[in-house]
Every structure is written in structure tokens, then in C-alpha cells.
Amino acid sequence: MATTSRRPVLTRAKVIVPVLLAVALVIAFVAIFTRLYTDLLFYRSVDFSKVFTTVIYTRILLFLIFGAVMAVVIGTNIVLGYRFRPQLRPLSTEQQNLERYRSAIEPYMKLVLVAVAAVFGLAAGLSASGRWRTWLLWVNGESFGTKDPQFHRDISYYAFTYPFQRFLLGFLLTAVLLSLLVTVLTHYLFGGIRLQTPGERVTPAAKAHISVLLGLLALLKAWAYYLDRFGSVFSSRGVATGASYTDVHAVLPAKLILLFISLACAVLFIYNIFQRGWTLPLLGAGILVLSSVVIGGIYPAFIQQFQVRPNEATREQPYIERNIAATRAAYGIQNVKPQSYAARTDVTAAQVAADTGTVPNTRLLDPSKLSRTFQQLQQIRGYYTFPKTLDVDRYTVTGADKKQTTRDYVVSVRELNQAGLGADQRNWINEHLTYTHGKGFVAAPSNTVDEGQPAFDEGEQNLPQKGDFDVRENRVYFGEMSPNYSVVGTRQVEIDGPGPGADTQVTTTYTGDGGVSIGSTFRQALFALRFGEKNLLLSGDITKNSRILYERNPRDRVSKAAPWLTLDGDPYPAVVNGRITWILDGYTTSDGYPYSARRTLGDVTADSVTAQSGNRARQAANQVNYIRNSVKATVDAYDGTVTLYAWDESDPVLRTWMKAFPDTVKPKKDISPSLMAHLRYPEDLFKVQRDLIGQYHVSDPRDFYSQEDFWQVSESPDGSGQPQPPFYVYSKLPDRSGPSYNLTSPLISARSSKLAAYMAVSSDPSNYGQFTLLKLPPGGTINGPVQVQNAIESNGDVANKLTLWRGAGSQTIEGNLLTLPVAGGLLYVEPYYVQARGGSGYPTLQGIATAFGERIGFGTSLGEALDKVFGSGAGAAAAGAGTGATTTTGGGGQATTQGGGTGAAPPGGTSGLQDAVNDADSAYKAGQDALRKNPPDFNAYGQAQTDLADALSRLRTLASPPTTPPAASPTPSRSAAPTTRGTAAGSAPPGTTPAVAAPAGPSGPPSPAGATAGPPQQPRAAPPPG
């Protein structure tokens, strides 16, 4: 009965298990096919299908080759172990126990053999397929045209061939070791190895089999020692990267000796086939291990300790020279030469006023601090947003005087923010068919403000787009904040921003070629599987003309189109030929440049901005010792077109990848002038180079060894503990005839916080990549950024202002602390923004601090702050660069005034606020005077504190936003005729508390808080149409 009851169970198990396996295989196949096919459709949509097929074919080839080799090797050794099994086995407890396993396995021996070989082959094939980059570099490697100084081999051997040889060696070692393992197990299972049986413990056949494998292992070890010799050029044993004195005079000879010992051991293992016992193999293995310890370890350590250490500077000198030359060449800094810069501190007001190349262009808007300001002033609708960190670019525009001037702007695009939709609007149709794109390019001159707010030249609080940049297509379907996917060209119209009425919307239908056609049921089903959304298959709104947009982040699109590139972490938008275009910098890297110092990209490119920014990607923790900005990439914001341009056509790594992926990178000559005008020196590359310049500006090996003149990147003065980021500024450098668009960074001494150097590189097409490295006198006294920040905030005037602002219910935000070469010295400039605490405020510029030497100045404009440092007239070139009305300054430093209104009145009325500020200032001074008396007058001090508290209370009341903000219209009112704005119109008096903005509603832009309490607000005039 028991047997009968089990039969149905066993029968069901025999049916269910294969069915479940079949279903699992079908699901896996469908999932893999769906992903691969939809990826192929993406690559076809951007005309990079050759990249997809090349990578897939290469991975399949590697999978088949290495998987098959591993499977055959493992399977062959199992077969040999089984075939060479003894026919008769001595009777013992061990063999009796093993017999049960033999009886269970032998009927299914072929199945076991195939299964074991398949498992190892599958694992090896999958592992090898991931090394497609190594394979393609080896197959297509181009010459560097430079040889290493030790072995005189072309650098391409170390960059392309050596990594593949190492991979192949590792694979073969793994195959032989696994073969040895399965061979020993097979012989043990079938009686060829008997551990607990008297007499012969290993049969001759098993001994021969194992001896051959051990001989192969010794041969591979000899090859490993041979490759180790070339690997010494990456050694970190000495003072600098590369083969050191000990490596050349001890390690290399030791590796050669160990190579021959390994060959001798291989001979002994093979010879052991004809000998009894294991004496010879054990002797050989013992000699190899002992030699590795003595010759490979103790001897080099002895040389290092007793020959090198006592005379290390002299012994290592030629190898340090090699490292310096190789590192400078590998990172593209071989032509960066320090030039002496006195950094004067005895500068007059007239000399500062005469510096019209830098002072008028000083950046006052910090792109990492003003996202909230752009959001409040330019959001327009709740379903639009701006990234956390804005970007900087430069544009040449025609001013009111018909002259063209170039200046830098803080720029961004108005991206789609579906999180801003109401709860009743969150449905699949709205999120994927209706709200599909952002709209608008927004730009504000970085050196200009209007009542503390950006003076937008492009992207005013209205659509369609108006401004100076001739934006003809401003829809953003591909952006940093775009949804995962959208379906366009459906029966649903797309929301395209606010209409002319208060509650109206403009609609549109996508007409571009971007994305993938999704008209067929087959494709709809595939994308429904990919995105896990049944509506893609069932929706009646999708037609034969519909297209699905996915992989929409510009960085992701370029990364898929060029998977061999390392991309800069900061894509930025620009207006190119009337279209919004994302620009990205692509790097070719290698870790195979002999003698070059290695850096971890994720470490050296991290700073205080990347640590806090949500839209700047951090580099991976990849070690490199060679890098080039070899590719400039663009992504069209409307149709997603990806274009790659060869920027450094001499780069051998780029040439190698172009050979592997032909016709995917366009030549440099195809870059249009409109695009060329917006290319800039990449930030991540500059961070790597400035880190290296801190050491490798030293060319003398003895000085390099002493490390006395090493520099480092300063900590950010914001207290984050991260390195200070570099800054893009439009400025005139001492070795240039005029202002240029530069990426800059100060460097401090590695032994103190004093400023040691100033580093800048140009982004202008005429002198792109030209470095300026200003070296300050040794033992200088110019403070570094952190020291300057402390000095500014401990200054009495600054402390007073900060106390008043913070006491009035607001918080202060320090902007970027810029270091600028001005009038033969170094000027620090830091804007101060103020915003109300809570969710309704946004930062407005209310003060500017300057520092020069030991002198600190603070004012409501840059000119005022400069006058306080240098004396009257110093700030003439910076007229208007501050918190007052809009005044723009051209590259030549001549100020031109734009038409418009006087700007918003402070909440609560100007006179009431000013009275409160004056009373607070007087009370504070009275208290300080009372304390300075001898003895202190504490009665007077107490009365002063009471008066101060009363003044601050009035300030809080006047500055508080209204509890119910007034309704906002979608389009700001415009004045009938523009009025002239002078530098005095609407200027914020010293100590004025900034206006606080109420949050923008879904139907329009924000309104100034407290507007009902003050005088009527005069509207700002619209800029002339672009």
C-alpha cells in the first residue's frame, strides 16, 4: 500500500519539475529578449546600432570561446579521471563508503559530466563576456608612439596588450586549478586515490594525471613571473609610482630567477610520471616557495633597507624623473609651467579701477545656491522645476549700444516636474501622455542683479520664450529630470505651458523623430513588459504614429551610445543654432601608462558641490593614470539626437575605440561655430589635473623628494569638509591681452593654509586648454580660502550685518568665494544671500564681501565693497554689480544701463524697514560704546539691549510674509513704457532686509511677500525679444 501511494506523488513530481523548469526558462528568455530588443530599438533610434551589435557579438564570442574552453578542460579531466579508474579496489571501510556514491553516480555519469562541465563553462563564459573592453582594446590597439624608459616597449603594450595577457593568464590559472580540483575528486571517488587504504595510495594513472596538471601550473607560474617584470612599471614600492631602484636592482632579477625555478619545477613534475613517490615534485615545490620568500621578498627588502634608505634621494633620483615625465604626459599637463606672481598687497584704488577685464565681470550669482530663486521667479507652473545646481556658460549678445559683448550667465532649463501635479492629476494618462516635457531656457548674467534678484535676459516669467539668445525650439523632452518614459504622438494632446488666460493651457503634439515607434501591438507588448505597465498594451490612445521616449537623461543617452567613455559629471544646456542642446565632455582613460601616478576618479573629483548636488553625477571609484578629454558629445533636448565629436584626435585610446566602433565619432572639423562657442574646459578633468599639479609642478627630483613645495586643494570655506570646487569665471589673466572664459582654482601650501598658487585654464576657442599657473613667493602671507572666510565673518561690519539679518527672521547663505587676480594681487569676492526661514523664502543677494591681503570690505554692491578695501573710486569699474537696480557691464568694463522699472519695494514699506534698521544699528553701537567705557556703563548697556530687541521685533514684523499670499497671474503685468534704470534707482540701503517671496501657485509665478503692506510695486519691463 505504501508503495502504491507513492507512485502518483512521484509521477506528479516528474511532470511538475520539468514544467516549472520550462516555465522558468521561458520567462528568463522573454525577459532577456525584451531587454535586448528594446535596447536595440534605442540604438537604432540614435543611429548607434553598430555599438550595440559590436558589443553583443564580442560578448557572445568571448562567452563561447572561454566558456567552451573551460567546459572542455573540466570535462576532459573528469573523463580522464573516470577512464583511468582502477578496475579492482582494495577492500576497506573507505572504499565501502565510497561505493554507495559510485553506485548512485555511475548510471548518470554522462549527465553528471555534462552538468559539471556546463556549470563551469557557463560561469567562465559569463565572466569572460564582461571583459569585452579588454578584448576590443587588445584587438584594435593603436600605437602611442612613445616607449617606456625601462623595457623600451611602446606604451600601447601596457595599455592594451598587457591587461589582456593578465586576463588570459588568470583564466588559464583558474582552469588548471579547477581541473586539478575535479581531477583529485574524481580519482578519489573512483579509487585512484586511497587515503585510508594500506599499500599504494595513488595509482600510477592518477599520479601521471596530477603530475601533468602540476607541471602546467608551474609553466603558468613561470609566465606570471615573466609578466610581473613588466608590471613593475606600475610599482608603488618607491617614492613615486613606477619601477624604483629596488625594483630594478632586486625585484627584476628575482623575478627572472623565479621564472627559471618555475620552469625547472615544471620539468620535475613531468619527470615524476616515471618515478615512484612524490619526492621530486615536493622538492621542487619547496624550492619554489622558499625562493619566492627569500629571493622575491627578503632580498628586495634587504636592498631597500640597507642600500636605498640611507641614500634614498640619490638612489631614487632617476626613477623620480621618470615618474614626473610620465605623469605630466599622461595627464596632459606637460606644458603647464609655473610663472612667478608677486601677489601685491599695496594696490591703489586707481589700479583696481583700471582693471576692467576682471572686476566688471565678477560673478555674483552662485549657481549652486540659486536654484530656489530660479524656481520662485521662473517656475510659472507647479509642474515645472529647476535642478538643484544650475550651470554657467557664456554668450555674446548685442547691447543697447549695438556693440557685441561676451559675458557669463547662470543658465538652466525649465524641466518637467510631475511631482508638482495635484493628487487628482496623478494618473497614467497625465504622467505619460499629457505632461511629457519641460519648456524654456532661462539665463541671467552672473554679474548683475536687480533688487537682489537675477536680472533674467532669457526666459522671463512668460512663454513663449523671449530674450537675446534666439531660442527657436525650447521644448525639453530629453533632460536631467525627465520622466522614465513618455508616449508622444497619441490621441491625447500634450500640455505645453500656460496660455494667455489665467486658467488656460497651451497644448502641442510632438513632431520630432526622437524615440521609438510604438505603433505595433508587438512593440507595445514588449515595452509593457520592459516598464511593467499594462496600459502601454491596452490604451486606446496609442496610435500607429505614436512614439515612446525613454533613456531620456542626456548622460544616460551618451553613456549607452559610447559605453567606452567616462563622462563628466556635469552636462550643461546651451542654445546652439536656436535649439536647446545638452553638452557633455567624454574622457578616454587608462590605468596602463608606465610610471604615471594613479588617481581614483571618484576621490579627486569630489567637492562640496558634488556632495550636495542631486544632478551632478559622482565619478566611480576607478583608478586611472592616463586621461584625455577626447570627445565632446551633444544631445538635442527636443529629439534626443546624440552626436559625438573627436576633440583630441591625436589620442591613441580614442583612435583605438574609433577603430573598434567605426563611423560613430565625427571629426573635429564638423563642430559648428555655434557649438564651438559654448564648449568649455571640463570640470572633472580640471579637478584631476589640479590635484596632480599640486605635486608635479615640481620638476627637480630632489625637490620632489623633499616635498617642501607641494600644494593641495583647499577645503571649501562652507565648512563641509569637502574640497573647494573650481569656478568658471570671465576674467583677464596676467598673461592674456583681454578677458577670457576660464576655469579657476586657488591652491594652498601642503604645509599650511596660506595661498601658494592660482591655477586657471581657458575655454575660449582661440586658446582652449591654455593653462596659467601663478606661483606666489615661497613663505607668502596671502591667506587661503578658509582663512579668508574666517576673517570675513569675524569682521565687525560683516558681523553686524549678519546679526541684523539673522535676527530679522532670515538666514544667510554664503555664495562662492572667488579668487581673482586683480591689479597684480589676488582679490577674494564672496556674495551673501538672505532668505526668510521656512518654505516660502528664496535667496536674494544682499551683500558682497571682498578681501585683499588683510583688508576686508563689505557693501551692498561690489563697488561699495571695493571702495571700503582700496578707497574711494576703486569700485568704479564694478558700478551696479550689487544688490541694487539692474546695471550690466560689458567685457570691456563700460557700464550700460537697461530700461525697466525700479524693482519691487521691500515688504512692509521702505521707510518702516529703514527706520527699524537704523534704530537697531544705533542701539547696537550704543551698547558697544557703553561696554568700552572704563568702568563699563551696564545701565546704558541694558537700555541699549532693550532698544535693540524692540528694533529687531519691528524688523521681524515688517519682514514676515503674509499668511495668505495674493493671487498671482500667469503673466506679469508690463509697464506701458520702460523707464530708465540708474544705479541709484531702487538701490537697497545698507542693512535693508530682503524681500521674501511667497511660494508660486500652480497658475502663475510667485508674488513678493508683504506686497499688500507696502507701496504699489512698479512692474519690471520685459527685455527686448531675442
From Swiss-Prot:
Bias (Gly residues) ranges: 889-903
Membrane-topology descriptor: Multi-pass membrane protein
Signal peptide segment: none
Comp. bias regions, Pro residues: 1016-1026
Transmembrane segments: 13-33, 60-80, 108-128, 167-187, 208-228, 250-270, 283-303
Superkingdom as given in the UniProt entry: Bacteria
Residue ranges, annotated region (Disordered): 877-916, 958-1026
Low complexity bias locations: 877-888, 970-1001
Assigned keywords, A-Z: Cell membrane, Membrane, Transmembrane, Transmembrane helix
Subcellular location, record wording: Cell membrane
Cellular compartments per GO CC: extracellular region; plasma membrane
Family: Belongs to the UPF0182 family.
HAMAP family per UniProt: UPF0182
PANTHER family in UniProt: UPF0182 PROTEIN SLL1060
Annotated protein name in UniProt: UPF0182 protein FRAAL6027
Organism from which the protein derives: Frankia alni (strain DSM 45986 / CECT 9034 / ACN14a)
Lineage: Bacteria, Bacillati, Actinomycetota, Actinomycetes, Frankiales
